[in-house]
A protein has these predicted regions:
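Beta-strand-rich extracellular modules
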Residues: 251-253
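Juxtamembrane/interface motifs at transmembrane-helix termini
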Residues: 215, 245-246
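Conserved, short, structured surface segments that act as functional micro-motifs
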Residues: 237, 241-242, 248-249
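A conserved acidic, glycine/proline-rich C-terminal tail/linker
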Residues: 208-238
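Catalytic-core "active-site belt" of small-molecule-metabolizing enzymes
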Residues: 5-204, 242-245, 255-261
Length: 261
């Protein structure tokens, strides 16, 4: 948890209760309309604190999801659990799935540590610390019946609906490619659900990674070699069914597949 966040004992009790309600809703596949008003996070910092409590209960950190609604907006981020990662083509057990949401994304694998420091990392330093770039599918589940209708901070606290991560093969020459020139397609069971999708960050995906390395270091403890950073949806949330096969395809970056068994 972020050492810079100071919460009272009463606040911690309230947020622990919120985290437990979200965890129970995910475990039982019995979604909530929202948290009770008395338990909802009141600030973004409180929402992130709930995320950290949920991560502690669910398992080991494998990386971070980070995104922004516009090229100028301050990014939002959430931890991704290593135990929910899968390989392209793998089958996801559906007894733990309710939404079966999928999003096409582009992700980076860190090759070097970027520990916290007072001097901000430059863009070049961050790029040099990245080992590889990959197409990816983020898997989405939620403790909330409709995350878009619930309180915004509750939705953020609920790991921003993250439920898994599926990277594809590494892309050669990615450092010389303009992400703004790329687009994405999502197929489910052979039918194109979205085509021509663009990233909300305006193509500058590396801005998000640089921000994560610098502005979020008090909470993340720095970025570490072996962690994955996925940088937001190109297709929006697409819902699949039990038995579905979802394929995210990028013209330049290739494709990645996930199956719901």
């Amino acid at each position: 948890m972020d050492p810079q966040t100071t919460l009272s004992g009463a606040d911690k009790d309230r947020l622990y209760q919120a985290a437990e309600m979200l965890l129970e809703a995910r475990r039982t596949l019995q979604p909530l309309d929202d948290l009770p008003a008395t338990l909802r996070p009141k600030t973004l910092e409180e929402a992130y604190w709930v995320q950290d409590v949920m991560l502690e209960a669910l398992g080991t950190l494998g990386g971070w999801k980070v995104g922004a609604p516009t090229p100028e907006a301050t990014p939002l981020y959430a931890p991704m659990r290593l135990g929910t990662f899968a390989g392209s083509g793998d089958r996801i057990a559906t007894q733990y799935c309710r939404m079966r949401g999928v999003e096409a994304e582009i992700a980076f694998l860190m090759g070097k540590d970027l520990p916290p420091r007072s001097t901000p990392y430059t863009r070049q330093e961050v790029v040099e610390a990245i080992a590889s770039c990959h197409p990816a599918i983020e898997l989405l589940e939620s403790a909330l019946l409709d995350p878009d209708a619930a309180d915004r901070l509750t939705s953020i606290a609920d790991l921003q609906s993250n439920a898994g991560f599926v990277p594809g093969a590494a892309v050669e020459g990615w450092r010389n490619f303009a992400f703004a020139d790329e687009s994405a397609q999502m197929k489910v069971d052979g039918f194109i659900r979205v085509t021509g999708g663009k990233n909300a960050a305006g193509g500058d995906l590396l801005r998000l990674v640089v921000w994560l390395a610098n502005d979020a270091q008090g909470r993340t403890g720095g970025l570490r070699a072996g962690q994955w950073i996925t940088t937001g949806s190109w297709t929006g949330k697409i819902l699949a069914d039990s038995g579905s096969v979802a394929v995210a395809r990028f013209p330049r970056f290739g494709e990645v597949t996930v199956r719901f068994g």
